[in-house]
A protein has these predicted regions:
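Class I SAM-dependent methyltransferase SAM-binding "motif I" and its flanking Rossmann-like core
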Residues: 136, 152-190
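C-terminal motif of bacterial Sec signal peptides marking the signal peptidase cleavage site
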Residues: 38-41
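Catalytic beta-strand/loop cores that center a nucleophilic Ser/Cys/Thr
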Residues: 173-242, 273-274
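Bacterial signal peptide processing site
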Residues: 43-45
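Extracellular ligand-binding/catalytic regions of CAZymes and related secreted enzymes
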Residues: 49-55, 132, 158, 235-274
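Helical hinge/lid and interdomain linker segments adjacent to catalytic or ligand-binding clefts
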Residues: 62-155
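N-terminal secretory signal peptides that target proteins for export/translocation
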Residues: 1-23
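Short, solvent-exposed loop/turn segments at secondary-structure junctions
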Residues: 67-68, 115-116, 148-150, 166, ...
Length: 274
């Protein structure tokens, strides 16, 4: 550590007895090694101002900044942990300070649920451009609920990965329902999913799952060289979110579907679709 530097400063050649040439050579060598170690130990460990090498970073960048639900960040992290997938979290100020190339050093950006207006407003217009360009040039993207709204042509610094399409809320919102267990059909099976003020995604990408009214609940597509998956429901939702609701699908099955979406986004896999 840095204390070793103070020790090396006492290793001056003039402090050695005259005629101790051999000892002088040995101690001088030790001093050089200790000084080198000291400066290495004192070097800042952060990645500010540089793009980390691929071996230094996790493959997944998880946004946990303003507007996203801390509970949903925790839910996503639990799925990632169960799948043995490493991630790094990034808040709004840090993401605002990242260049396109820095963002693109990751393989997948996940933006969880929350308030898409606050989320977008916490980021600068140039940051939205950097994210958009990173996706165009190969970064993959998974948007969950608010993250899906943010991917569209949102007036709140939206990424507009959708050629101008702005997503609307799923029809339950117009009936005054704010959260519910909603049955989606995906891959030939019916899954009861936790829904809370999420979008319907009709009009963009390939439809992988549908709401009961036939509108798109989960879609998949590309933007430039980037692979994009958007979901209006929360398959990652923990059991605690289900209180007071009736689900016919177990939380383990729903969470397994969340893991499927994450891996598909990470590995650029086309899932069963309509």
């Amino acid at each position: 550590m840095c204390n070793s530097l103070n020790h090396t400063l006492t290793c001056r050649e003039g402090s050695l007895p005259l005629g101790a040439a051999t000892v002088r050579v040995v101690l001088t060598t030790v001093c050089v090694v200790l000084i080198s170690m000291a400066f290495s130990a004192c070097r800042p460990s952060g990645d500010k101002g540089r793009i980390p090498a691929a071996a230094e970073i996790a493959p997944i960048l998880l946004f946990n900044g303003a507007g996203v639900s801390p509970g949903d960040v925790a839910a996503v992290e639990k799925i990632l942990s169960s799948e043995h997938l490493n991630d790094s979290t990034v808040n709004s100020p840090r993401l605002n300070g990242m260049s396109e190339s820095h963002i693109r050093a990751y393989r997948l950006l996940i933006v969880p649920g929350g308030n898409f207006e606050q989320l977008g407003d916490s980021l600068t217009a140039s940051t939205a451009v950097n994210i958009r360009n990173a996706i165009r040039n190969g970064l993959n993207y998974l948007g969950i609920c608010a993250g899906a709204f943010f991917a569209g042509n949102s007036p709140y610094n939206g990424l507009n990965l959708t050629s101008g399409l702005r997503f609307e809320f799923y029809a339950a919102e117009a009936r005054g329902i704010r959260k519910a267990a909603v049955a989606i059909t995906a891959g030939g099976q019916t899954l009861d999913q936790y829904w809370e003020d999420g979008p319907q995604l009709t009009g963009w990408g390939v439809v992988m799952a549908k709401y009961p009214d036939g509108t798109a609940a989960v879609v998949e597509g590309t933007f430039g060289s980037g692979w994009v998956i958007l979901t209006g429901v929360h398959p990652e939702a923990p059991a605690s979110w289900r209180r007071g609701m009736d689900f016919r699908t177990s939380v383990n099955i729903d969470n397994a579907y969340a893991a499927t979406l994450i891996r598909a986004a990470l590995n650029r896999e086309l899932l069963p679709h309509y």
